[in-house]
Curated annotation (Swiss-Prot):
PANTHER family with a match to the protein in the record: EMBRYONIC ALPHA GLOBIN E1-RELATED, HEMOGLOBIN FAMILY MEMBER
Record's miscellaneous remark: This fish has two hemoglobins: cathodic and anodic. The cathodic Hb and anodic Hb display small and large Bohr effects respectively. In addition, the cathodic Hb displays a reverse Bohr effect and appreciable phosphate effects.
Role: Involved in oxygen transport from gills to the various peripheral tissues.
UniProt family annotation: Belongs to the globin family.
Pfam families, per the entry: Globin
GO molecular function: haptoglobin binding; heme binding; metal ion binding; organic acid binding; oxygen binding; oxygen carrier activity; peroxidase activity
One Gene Ontology biological process: hydrogen peroxide catabolic process
Taxonomic source organism: Anguilla anguilla
Residues the entry annotates as binding heme b: 89
Record's protein name: Hemoglobin cathodic subunit alpha
Keywords of the record: Acetylation, Heme, Iron, Metal-binding, Oxygen transport, Transport
């Protein structure tokens, strides 16, 4: 599914509104994923605390959303822009690529909860398409 010019405009505009809270959104999305999908805990077993708001969750949530923000600026070549991250997740960390969809869903939930006025139906669709494309780009090295 490709992103239209309108999708890209909506994504860029929404990101500008939420970017100042991106670290918190990332921590919330990651916390939600770990709680709601406990099988994902296996990837973070080296962390001393997996609880919502823990330093490790906050730190990695920030890393995740920094990568999402970087991808917003590189929407025209997500596979190229995320090549190194795809390598890391596929070969070093061995993350099941299905988890990208799970995390994307939780990012959408965090955005909807924290930005109910700005997270319109149109923005929701555009962000869902974007995060699906981002997940597909991260899964590129798995093939």
């Amino acid at each position: 599914m490709s992103l239209t010019a309108k999708d890209k405009s909506l994504i860029t505009g929404f990101w500008q509104k939420i970017s100042s809270k991106a670290d918190d959104l990332g921590a919330e999305a990651l916390s939600r994923m770990i709680v709601v999908f406990p099988a994902t805990k296996v990837y973070f077993s080296h962390w001393p605390d997996l609880g919502p708001g823990s330093p490790s969750v906050k730190k990695h949530g920030k890393v995740i959303m920094a990568a999402v923000g970087d991808a917003v600026g590189k929407m025209n070549d997500l596979v190229g822009a995320l090549s190194a991250l795809s390598d890391l997740h596929a070969f070093k960390m061995r993350i099941d690529p299905g988890n990208f969809k799970t995390l994307s869903h939780n990012i959408l939930v965090a955005c909807a909860v924290n930005f109910p006025v700005d997270f319109t139906a149109e923005v929701h669709v555009a962000m869902d398409k974007f995060l699906a494309a981002l997940g597909a780009a991260l899964s590129d090295k798995y093939r």
